[in-house]
Amino acid sequence: MSIRFWVVAVLALCCASAAVAEPNAHELWVNVGGFSSHFNSSKNYNENNAGIGVEYRVSPQTSVMAGSYYNSIRHTTTYAAVNWQPYLLGNVKMGVALGMMDGYPSIVRGGTFFAALPLVTYEGKKLGVNLGIIPDMAKVNGAFVVQFKFRVY
């Protein structure tokens, strides 16, 4: 993992926390698992993306997240992102996760790259789920992704 990845990740987390923190909005979640369903199912992707991460909600619309998982092409991916979800409908939040990740050899030879992921989140009192869509792009086959989360604070 490159130093640049961690510098960008820490700066993003600090800036997001300072810019949008609101009283009584702080929650800590542990994100586990991960499943994907690829639009192109003929490529024999791994769709059981085991992993673990943390997500810290700094406001009703914003959280920061970091973690690691076994990706669809059977490499380990590490990520750090700011999750901005300005659209709220009860316990459902909609928006985008913006961050850095690695572990995909077809993109910058497996190095660190910027990613944006449309994200819908449901959060109950103790359990939640993140639902994302990875769009089809040049070297990326799109997929639906699911990540489960447990509130610890």
Name each region found by the language model:
Residues 20-68:
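Short glycine/proline- and aromatic-enriched beta-strand/turn motifs that initiate or cap beta-hairpins
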Residues 39-47, 68-78, 88, 102-113, ...:
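Solvent-exposed loop/turn segments connecting transmembrane beta-strands
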Residues 32, 52-56, 80-84, 118-122, ...:
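Residues on the lipid-exposed face of transmembrane beta-strands in outer-membrane beta-barrel proteins
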Residues 17, 21-22, 58-60, 83-89, ...:
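Outer-membrane beta-barrel proteins
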Residues 1-25:
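Cleavable N-terminal export/targeting peptides
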Residues 30-38, 62-71, 93-106, 120, ...:
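Transmembrane beta-strand segments that form the barrel wall of outer-membrane beta-barrel proteins
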Residues 24-28, 60-62, 76, 90-94, ...:
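Outer-envelope beta-barrel architecture signal
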Residues 30, 34-38, 141-153:
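Outer-membrane beta-barrel "beta-signal"
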